[in-house]
């Protein structure tokens, strides 16, 4: 059973031709996700000088994770957890190198 909305509030997914405000549009975009793709090529006398491939994904964090996009979790500049794992890896590497050097001097 659905609860009726108060008469003054429009449905965010209304399809009766009513205009949507910015918040409704943003909610839809973040909920569903939008992909914008484009290529820019610069040629001079049939010689390709530059190719730029643009891919833009606009989505909520939850939707991005559902799509398998989670690069911010492993980027040390963006995630404290990634910095911790990087620090632990560097620490283990330094300990291994110290053990090797101590083994050579004995």
Curated annotation (Swiss-Prot):
PROSITE patterns xref list: GAS_VESICLE_A_1 (PS00234)
UniProt keyword annotation of Cell membrane present: no
GO-annotated molecular function: structural molecule activity
Keyword Transmembrane helix: no
Expression triggers: Gas vesicle production is induced by growth conditions that promote production of secondary metabolites tiancimycin A and B.
Origin: domain of life: Bacteria
Subcellular location: Gas vesicle
One Pfam family, short name: Gas_vesicle
A GO cellular component annotation in the UniProt record: vesicle membrane
InterPro entries cross-referenced by the UniProt entry: Gas-vesicle_GvpA-like, GvpA, GvpA-like_CS
Principal subcellular localisation of the protein: other
Similarity comment: Belongs to the gas vesicle GvpA family.
Misc remark: This strain probably produces some gas vesicles from the probable gvpO-gvpA-gvpF-gvpG-gvpJ-gvpL-gvpS-gvpK operon; it can be induced to produce more under certain growth conditions.
Name the UniProt record assigns to this protein: Gas vesicle protein J
Gene: gvpJ
């Amino acid at each position: 059973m659905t609860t009726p909305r108060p008469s003054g509030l429009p449905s965010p997914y209304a399809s009766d031709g009513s205009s949507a405000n910015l918040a409704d549009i943003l909610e839809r975009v973040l909920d569903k996700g939008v992909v914008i793709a484009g290529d820019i090529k610069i040629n001079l006398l049939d010689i390709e000088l530059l190719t730029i491939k643009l891919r833009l994904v606009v989505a909520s964090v939850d939707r991005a994770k559902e799509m398998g996009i989670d690069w911010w979790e492993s980027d040390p500049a963006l995630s404290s957890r990634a910095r911790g794992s990087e620090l632990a890896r560097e620490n283990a590497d330094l300990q291994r190198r110290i053990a090797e050097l101590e083994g050579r001097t004995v």
